[in-house]
A protein has these predicted regions:
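Bacterial Sec-dependent N-terminal signal peptides
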Residues: 1-26
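A sensor for short, sequence-defined functional sites
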Residues: 23-637
Length: 637
C-alpha cells in the first residue's frame, strides 16, 4: 500500500511541472504559428460565442475571448468592455492578462470594472451603460482573456458572428454556438462563407460554426468595407421579444405591421392649439408639397435633437404631444412629431428605418430589427420625399451623405416596404469655381474667388455659415488651401440657398510670395484654388476590388492678370484624359498680352471596379496631381 502511494506521489511530482508549463504555454505568444503573426497587430487565439435560447423572451449569452496583442496598434482589438441596460443582467465578468511567456500578471473580477453611462453628447437620458477595464500595457506581446455571461429578455437581437474582427488581426480559432432546446424557428444569413474555411456542423434548430487558422488581412485603400469582404453571420427568431414587447415576423410585411401596431400607433396625438396653428400656417399653400415644406421648417424652428433611450424608448418614439410641449426629441421622436404635424393637414407620411452615416443598406433578404436611425418618407404620388428631422438647418427634402443612396425600411400600416433613398452621384455633386487673379512684380497674388457647391459638395459646406470669422479663416488657410503658404483672407461672404440646395462662397484673399523668382524670370503654379492631392497608395499585388465611394465634377475658370513688365512666351498645351473613372481636362487661352484664362474640369465616377483596374486608377490620379501642379514661366520684358 505504501509503495502504491509512493508511486502516485512520485508521478504527481513528475507531472506537476509539465502541467504548469502547459498552462503557461497555452497563452504564451510563441505558441502561435508564424503565419498568424504575419501582417498582424493582434491574434484571436480563441473566441467563443455561446448562445442559449431558453424562451421567446429569455436568452443567455456566454462569450470568451483570448486575444494576443502584438503591438500598440493591436490594443483596440482586445477591448475589455460590455454594454448593458435595464433589460440585461450580467452574471459573469472577468479578465486576465498574461505576459509573452504565458505568465499571469493581472487578474480582474467583476467589481474591478468601471461602470459608466453610455450616454453620448446630445442625449438627455438613457439606461445604456458600459462596464470596462482601463489597462495600459508596459510590454508587448501580451494576452488578454476576457469572459462574460449575461441574460436578457430581448431576443430581437441575437448576437452576430464576425470571426475576423477587421484588418491586421489573424484568427487561430473563432467559434459560434447557438443552442435552441425549444426548437424555435430561426433564420440565418451567411455572408462570404464561401471565401473562407468556415466549418459548419449546424442542424435545423441549432448552430455551430468554426473558423481556424486564418491569416491577417491587410487593408487596402479605395476598397470595399471589411464587412463586405469578410465572413459574417446574422441570426434572427421569427418569434421574438423586444424590451417586453413580443412580436412575430418572417418577412418585411409582417415586421412592418408589428412595428406599426406595437411601437408607432397612438403616438401622434397633438393638442388643439397646435393643430390650429399648423392649419393657419398652410392656409395659403396650394399644394401638399408647399404645405409639407412650411410644416418642416416650422418643426425645425421649434425643436432640437436630444437622445431619449430608456427601455422600449430606444425603439418607440416619445409621444408627439410631449415633443410639442418640450421642444426636443431623438430621431424617432422628432420624426414622429413631423408625421403628426403632417397628419393635421392630411399629408400621408411614414416612419422609416435606416442605417445612417456609413453607407450601409437594410438587408433586403433578412427581415429583422435593423437600422440605427429614423427618417420620414412622404410618398408624394410615387415621387418620394425624404425628411431628416434631427437637423435644424438642412433643406427640405435633402438627405446628404448621412442617409442617401441606401435601402431603407418604410413602415406602413399595411407592413414594411423596402425603398431606396435618393442618390447624389457623379455630376450631381458639383463644385464650380470662378477666380479673378492678379499677380504683382513683387511675386504676390490677390484674388476674388466665387465657389458654388451642390449635392454632397453642398452637404460638406452648408454648415460653414455657422462658423465664427476666425474659424472660417482658419478653415480656408489650414484645410481648403493648406498647400498655399502665406494666405490671408480679407473678406468672406457665404450664401446658403436652400431653395436650390446650393452654397456660394465669395472670398477675397491675398498670398504673399506666391510667385517664385527664377533669374530674371518668374514661375507660378497656374492652379491656385483646386489642386488634387489624393494619390492612392501603391500595391505590388492588389487583392481587393477598387471602390470609388463618391463621384463628382469640378469646374474651374481662372482669369489671371500678369504682373507689369512680364509676359508669357508660350502657354502649355491642352491636356485631356478620359477613361472609365472620369475626365480630366485643362485648357489655356491668351485673352491679351496681359491676361490669360485657365479652364479645368475634373470628374470622377462612383463605382466598383476589378482589382486589375487599380493601377490604372492610381496612374490617373498621379497625372491629375502632376498637371494640377503645372508651372508657367513669366518672362521679363
Amino acid at each position: 500500500m505504501n509503495l502504491k502511494y509512493s508511486r502516485i506521489i512520485l508521478l504527481a511530482i513528475f507531472l506537476f511541472p509539465i502541467f504548469i508549463f502547459s498552462q503557461k504555454a497555452k497563452y504564451a505568444s510563441f505558441a502561435t504559428a508564424r503565419v498568424l503573426k504575419t501582417n498582424a497587430n493582434a491574434i484571436t487565439r480563441n473566441s467563443t460565442t455561446e448562445i442559449t435560447i431558453e424562451a421567446v423572451d429569455k436568452i443567455v449569452i456566454h462569450k470568451k475571448r483570448v486575444i494576443t496583442v502584438l503591438n500598440k496598434l493591436g490594443i483596440a482589438d482586445a477591448p475589455m468592455s460590455i454594454g448593458y441596460d435595464n433589460d440585461t443582467k450580467i452574471t459573469k465578468l472577468s479578465a486576465k492578462i498574461y505576459d509573452a511567456f504565458g505568465k499571469e500578471i493581472k487578474k480582474y473580477k467583476k467589481r474591478d470594472f468601471l461602470d459608466v453611462s453610455a450616454v453620448e453628447h446630445g442625449t438627455l437620458y438613457s439606461d445604456d451603460r458600459i462596464k470596462y477595464l482601463r489597462y495600459t500595457p508596459t510590454n508587448y506581446p501580451y494576452t488578454v482573456v476576457f469572459e462574460t455571461t449575461y441574460k436578457t429578455n430581448s431576443t430581437a437581437f441575437i448576437p452576430r458572428w464576425f470571426p475576423i474582427n477587421g484588418y491586421y488581426i489573424s484568427v487561430e480559432k473563432s467559434e459560434y454556438i447557438l443552442k435552441n432546446p425549444l426548437n424555435l424557428p430561426i433564420r440565418t444569413l451567411k455572408n462570404n462563407f464561401e471565401n473562407y474555411p468556415v466549418e459548419d456542423t449546424s442542424s435545423p434548430f441549432n448552430l455551430h460554426y468554426v473558423l481556424k487558422n486564418q491569416a491577417a488581412i491587410k487593408a487596402e485603400s479605395n476598397s470595399l468595407s471589411y464587412l463586405d469582404l469578410m465572413p459574417s453571420l446574422f441570426v434572427s427568431l421569427n418569434n421574438f421579444s423586444l424590451k417586453g414587447v413580443k412580436g412575430f415576423a418572417s418577412n418585411w410585411e409582417e415586421f412592418g405591421k408589428w412595428m406599426h401596431q406595437k411601437l408607432l400607433t397612438e403616438n401622434t396625438q397633438l393638442k388643439t392649439s397646435t393643430k390650429l396653428e399648423i392649419k393657419s400656417l398652410v392656409k395659403n399653400a396650394h399644394t401638399d408639397l408647399e404645405k409639407a415644406k412650411i410644416i418642416y421648417e416650422y418643426m425645425q424652428r421649434k425643436t432640437r435633437y436630444i437622445g431619449v433611450q430608456i427601455g422600449i424608448g430606444g425603439w418607440k418614439p416619445i409621444p408627439a404631444n410631449e415633443v410639442d410641449n418640450v421642444g426636443y426629441g431623438d430621431c424617432k421622436g422628432l420624426t414622429n412629431y413631423m408625421k403628426a404635424l403632417l397628419d393635421v393637414v392630411g399629408i400621408e407620411s411614414y416612419h422609416t428605418l435606416v442605417y445612417a452615416k456609413r453607407n450601409r443598406n437594410i438587408i433586403k433578404n433578412f427581415p429583422s430589427l435593423q437600422g440605427n436611425h429614423m427618417i420620414l418618407n412622404i410618398p408624394n404620388n410615387g415621387n418620394d420625399i425624404w425628411l431628416e428631422c434631427t437637423s435644424q438647418t438642412i433643406p427640405f427634402g435633402f438627405l446628404g451623405d448621412f442617409t442617401d443612396d441606401r435601402d431603407v425600411l418604410v413602415v406602413t400600416p399595411e407592413g414594411g416596404v423596402i425603398k431606396h433613398t435618393p442618390k447624389y452621384i457623379n455630376h450631381k455633386n458639383s463644385q464650380e469655381t470662378i477666380a479673378t487673379i492678379k499677380l504683382t512684380s513683387s511675386g504676390n497674388l490677390s484674388a476674388a474667388v466665387e465657389r458654388t457647391s451642390k449635392g454632397i459638395k453642398y452637404d460638406k459646406k452648408y454648415h460653414l455659415d455657422k462658423k465664427s470669422k476666425k474659424n472660417l479663416e482658419n478653415y480656408y488657410t489650414s484645410k481648403v488651401w493648406n498647400y498655399n503658404n502665406n494666405t490671408e483672407i480679407n473678406h468672406i461672404t457665404l450664401l446658403n440657398n436652400k431653395e436650390t440646395t446650393s452654397f456660394k462662397e465669395t472670398i477675397q484673399l491675398s498670398i504673399t510670395n506666391y510667385v517664385t523668382s527664377y533669374q530674371e524670370n518668374m514661375l507660378f503654379k497656374i492652379n491656385v484654388f483646386n489642386r488634387f492631392k489624393k494619390i492612392p497608395k501603391r500595391y505590388r499585388n492588389r487583392q481587393n476590388p477598387l471602390k470609388i465611394n463618391r463621384g463628382f465634377i469640378d469646374r474651374d475658370i481662372s482669369t489671371i492678370t500678369l504682373p507689369e513688365g512680364y509676359s508669357i512666351t508660350s502657354l502649355p498645351k491642352e491636356k485631356k484624359i478620359e477613361n472609365k473613372f472620369g475626365l480630366y481636362h485643362i485648357q489655356f487661352e491668351r485673352i491679351n498680352e496681359k491676361t490669360i484664362k485657365y479652364r479645368r474640369t475634373l470628374s470622377l465616377k462612383k463605382g466598383i471596379y476589378p482589382k486589375e483596374d487599380y493601377a490604372l486608377f492610381r496612374k490617373y490620379c498621379k497625372l491629375i496631381a502632376k498637371y494640377d501642379n503645372l508651372r508657367i514661366e513669366l518672362t521679363k520684358k
